[in-house]
């Protein structure tokens, strides 16, 4: 994304900082902290759904936002809970209802023309936690599994306030 963090390390750092700031603001206001992690694909230019209902970038398009991997979805859940979040709602649950195979190829200054795909290229997801037909994606199942793993821990985390800064760093 040209409007935010681009490397995985910078993106994770940004997510944690924003989660911590949200938790602090919610606690200061006497509110329960919620977070809205992203799980979508944003293709600029022509694209269509393939036979598995995943987005397929067509020649002339660029990938503006990519859908998080299954591992990144799990990480979003656990990292947010570790920051003190107590609620989640995802952006987005349902991907676009209709693809855009007839869209004009990307033209602009945000991305260099060399980033436009030359051949149909998978965007690695439908653009939401669910597919256009309402079926769960692997990312949706990963979020559900993470929430199921958290459930037995709820008595331990309810009422816990996170430390001001991380106790350590794992790289």
Predicted regions and their residues:
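Aromatic-lined carbohydrate-recognition surfaces of secreted/lumenal glycan-active proteins
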Residues: 14-15, 25-44, 88-93, 154-168
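A structural motif corresponding to the C-terminal end of an alpha-helix
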Residues: 21-33, 79-86, 142-156
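Aromatic- and acid-rich polysaccharide-binding/catalytic face
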Residues: 1-13, 76, 83-91
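Intrinsic disorder/low-complexity segments enriched in polar/charged and small flexible residues
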Residues: 46-49, 77, 92
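Aromatic- and carboxylate-lined catalytic core of secreted/periplasmic carbohydrate-active enzymes
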Residues: 87, 91-171
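Active-site clefts of carbohydrate-active enzymes
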Residues: 21-71, 98-101, 106, 122-132
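Well-ordered, non-membrane alpha-helical segments in soluble/globular domains
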Residues: 8-22, 66-74, 139-146
């Amino acid at each position: 994304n040209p409007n935010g963090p681009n490397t995985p390390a910078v993106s994770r750092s940004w997510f944690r900082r924003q989660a911590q700031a949200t938790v602090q603001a919610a606690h200061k206001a006497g509110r329960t902290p919620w977070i809205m992690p992203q799980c979508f694909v944003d293709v600029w230019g022509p694209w269509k759904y393939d036979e598995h209902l995943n987005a397929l970038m067509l020649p002339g398009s660029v990938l503006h936002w990519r859908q998080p991997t299954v591992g990144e979805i799990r990480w979003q859940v656990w990292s947010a809970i570790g920051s003190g979040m107590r609620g989640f709602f995802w952006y987005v649950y349902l991907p676009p209802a209709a693809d855009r195979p007839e869209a004009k190829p990307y033209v602009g200054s945000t991305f260099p023309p060399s980033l436009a795909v030359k051949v149909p290229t998978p965007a690695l997801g439908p653009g939401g936690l669910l597919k256009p037909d309402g079926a769960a994606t692997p990312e949706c199942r990963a979020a559900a599994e993470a929430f199921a793993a958290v459930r037995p821990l709820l008595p331990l985390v309810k009422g816990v306030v996170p430390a001001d800064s991380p106790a350590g760093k794992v790289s």
